[in-house]
């Protein structure tokens, strides 16, 4: 089971003027393994706040969010994110970037190299493993970030726009 569950999730911020802003109000959802969720809405509706809570960067005002029945209370290696700006380690190669999360999980080096090669092929970057990431186009960097993110999470196949 790998469900992401939000129950009565609330996030309230105070503005510099002391006004109360409800970024999230009683948000409930269950996302099962293999499902994708798209969050759409106008600026300021809570999309980034939800991602920050899901990543464990901030704690909700009330309610809970759990992954595999464990409350998310901080960043963890069981989740991966791809930011609008890929957040790659520019001094590392493509393969080293993808391998980063796998090394954090202390996987066998032969197994990790095989996984890195598989993910680079899936995202269309086969043969780019030894390329420094700063030499790639923006779109290619996003694909490296996607491969790095999903290589060590529970996801099995990426979706690219």
Residue ranges and their predicted role:
Residues 92-100:
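Short coil-to-helix segment of the ABC ATPase nucleotide-binding domain corresponding to the Q-loop/switch region
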Residues 99, 110-128:
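Conserved ABC ATPase "signature" region
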């Amino acid at each position: 089971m790998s469900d992401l569950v939000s129950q009565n999730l609330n996030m309230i911020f105070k503005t510099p003027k002391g006004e109360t802003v409800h970024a999230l109000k009683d948000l409930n959802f269950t996302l099962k393994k293999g499902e994708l969720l798209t969050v759409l809405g106008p600026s300021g509706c809570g999309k980034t706040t939800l991602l920050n809570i899901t990543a464990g960067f901030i704690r909700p005002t009330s309610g809970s969010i759990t992954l595999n029945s464990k409350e998310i209370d901080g960043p963890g290696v069981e989740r991966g994110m791809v930011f609008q700006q890929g957040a790659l380690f520019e001094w590392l190669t493509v393969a080293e970037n993808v391998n980063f999360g796998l090394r954090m999980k202390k996987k066998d080096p032969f197994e990790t190299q095989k996984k890195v090669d598989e993910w680079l092929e899936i995202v269309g970057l086969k043969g780019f493993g030894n390329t420094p990431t700063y030499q790639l186009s923006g779109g290619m960097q996003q694909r490296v970030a996607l491969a790095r993110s999903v290589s060590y999470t529970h996801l099995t196949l990426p979706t690219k726009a």
